[in-house]
Design a protein with these regions (language model features):
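Short, solvent-exposed loop/turn segments at the edges of secondary structure
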Residues: 43, 131-133, 157
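Caspase-like (clan CD) cysteine peptidase catalytic core
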Residues: 1-20, 24-106, 172-180
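Caspase-like cysteine protease fold
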Residues: 129, 142, 161, 165-202
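Cell-envelope and extracellular/periplasmic
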Residues: 20, 51-55, 141-143, 147-148, ...
Length: 202
């Protein structure tokens, strides 16, 4: 999808990419996370889970079915080059990368998987520098939080909040957008506390 998106982009375009689904931590093979984080975050990439991906490493899926944050960043970097400095690139991620990806007794769904996708490391794996964030990222929660759905609506809180705000988000500043999203999140507050984040630049 992102490859097709890039092919249709031109200078000055406004590009909006929205991922709503489950996320999972997977082994960081190129070492870029160690330059960004310390502790447990330094060994794992965040990934999006397509419908045909497996939850654990196996002959049918050695990680190639997952969409790691490194791969996402490379595609976004290519789109940024196509649209240039006058274009706008906005990425919304309605997922988290931990949790149980199930509905509990209170019908509250978490959009993450608590099992890490562990890929056997090869010795001497080179380190790579993280790609600079040249786009605006709207995240459903902070890295240590869980992302949940709006109870009774079967839709992620971030997706619902962005739908509520509509096209007005395009011209909002980062701080205003964060505040407006947080206000909507509070309307649907539940036992799972999550704080929306806006990082990077358009």
């Amino acid at each position: 999808y992102l490859t097709n998106c890039e092919a249709h982009c031109k200078q000055g375009d406004i590009v909006y990419i929205h991922y709503s689904g489950h996320g999972q931590l997977m082994t960081d093979l190129d070492g870029d996370e160690a330059m960004r984080w310390t502790g447990r975050h330094s060994e794992w990439d965040e990934s999006w889970i397509p419908y045909d991906a497996y939850m654990t490493y196996c002959p049918q899926d050695r990680g190639e079915r997952h969409f790691s944050d490194d791969e996402v960043a490379q595609f976004l970097q290519q789109i940024r080059r196509r649209i240039g400095s006058k274009g706008q690139l906005i990425v919304a991620i309605d997922a988290c990368h931990s949790g149980d990806a199930t509905c509990g007794d209170d019908d509250e769904c978490v959009r993450g998987v608590d099992i890490k996708f562990n890929i056997p490391r090869r010795p001497g794996t080179p380190s790579a520098k993280p790609i600079e964030e040249q786009w605006l990222t709207i995240s459903a929660c902070k890295p240590y939080q869980l992302s949940s759905e709006v109870k009774g609506k079967r839709v992620g809180k971030l997706s619902y909040a962005l739908y509520t705000l509509g096209r007005k988000t395009i011209n909002m500043s980062r701080s205003t957008l964060e505040k407006r999203l947080a206000d909507i999140f509070r309307t649907y507050e539940s036992r799972i506390r999550q704080t929306p984040m806006v990082t990077g630049r358009k």
